């Protein structure tokens, strides 16, 4: 299986005020591949990632998953569920009144897991990141790095087929950023997901299978 991006164009506005943000983007990401998107601010990275996640529609072009359009005419996933696309953002966005384990179990239950299945899965993921002793604490009791690790495991809770990460390490120091990206890469490889991450940090490029450079809405050679 692969995610195939074919000639994606995105314009904002109309007429004289029209801005061309993406100008014919083409690339492919295979199952189990971890790809980094890089480029200056305004190059179109976040717009592209937002389109891939179904949060924004393209002006023209097609995104294919498993040889079929990723989204139907109503902009709903056509060959997978919404839960099959996982998002990781720069900020953790944890729910302040939920304990750490609840941040994950509620996601699992909303996706159809039983309470027991969800709990088992959440505990295992939290063990993977060394937070098994923090299951019953609240977000305000966690460090910034711990919050981001919980948010990452929350994105992996439903075994998504596609992971989209937008600057998940931007607020972290170099050591924590490295650990976070190692964690993301490990999950993508172990569960054979399609992974795409935006980052400006060139120190993290070595963890990607491939780096795609964007400039002025186009992929550079």
Curated annotation (Swiss-Prot):
Pfam families linked to this entry: ABC_tran
Residues of the signal peptide: none
Domain ABC transporter: 3-221
Key words of the record: ATP-binding, Cell membrane, Membrane, Nucleotide-binding, Translocase, Transport
Family matches, as SUPFAM superfamilies: P-loop containing nucleoside triphosphate hydrolases
EC number: 7.6.2.-
Keyword Kinase applies: no
GO cellular component: plasma membrane
Compartments (UniProt record): Cell membrane
Gene3D superfamilies: P-loop containing nucleotide triphosphate hydrolases
InterPro entries with a match to the protein in the record: AAA+_ATPase (IPR003593), ABC_transporter-like_ATP-bd (IPR003439), ABC_transpr_LolD-like (IPR015854), MacB-like_ATP-bd (IPR017911), P-loop_NTPase (IPR027417)
Binding annotation for ATP: 39-46
Induction: Highly induced by hemin.
MF-aspect GO terms: ATP binding; ATP hydrolysis activity; transmembrane transporter activity
Entry membrane topology: Peripheral membrane protein
Family: Belongs to the ABC transporter superfamily. HrtA family.
Job of this protein: Part of the ABC transporter complex hrt involved in hemin import. Responsible for energy coupling to the transport system.
Subunit structure: The complex is composed of two ATP-binding proteins (HrtA), two transmembrane proteins (HrtB) and a solute-binding protein.
Name listed for the protein in its UniProt record: Putative hemin import ATP-binding protein HrtA
Source species of the chain: Staphylococcus aureus (strain Newman)
């Amino acid at each position: 299986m692969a995610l195939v991006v074919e000639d994606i164009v995105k314009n904002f506005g109309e007429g004289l005020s029209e801005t061309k943000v993406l100008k014919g983007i083409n690339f492919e990401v295979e199952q189990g591949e971890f790809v980094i998107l890089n480029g200056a601010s305004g190059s179109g990275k976040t717009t592209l990632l937002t389109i891939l996640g179904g949060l924004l529609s393209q002006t023209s072009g097609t995104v294919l998953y498993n040889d079929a359009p990723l989204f139907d005419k109503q902009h709903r996933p056509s060959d997978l569920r919404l839960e099959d696309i996982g998002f990781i953002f720069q900020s953790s966005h944890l729910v302040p009144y939920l304990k750490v384990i609840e941040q994950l179990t509620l996601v699992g239950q909303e996706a159809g897991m039983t309470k027991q299945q969800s709990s088992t899965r959440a505990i295992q993921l939290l063990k993977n990141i060394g937070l098994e002793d923090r299951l019953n604490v609240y977000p305000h009791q966690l460090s910034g790095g711990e919050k981001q690790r919980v948010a990452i495991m929350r994105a992996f809770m439903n075994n998504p087929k596609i992971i989209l990460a937008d600057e998940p390490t931007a607020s972290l120091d170099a050591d924590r950023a490295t650990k976070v990206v190692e964690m993301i890469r490990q999950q993508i490889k172990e569960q054979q997901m399609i992974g795409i991450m935006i980052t400006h940090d060139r120190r993290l490029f070595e963890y990607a299978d491939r780096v795609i450079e964007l400039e002025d809405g186009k992929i550079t050679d």
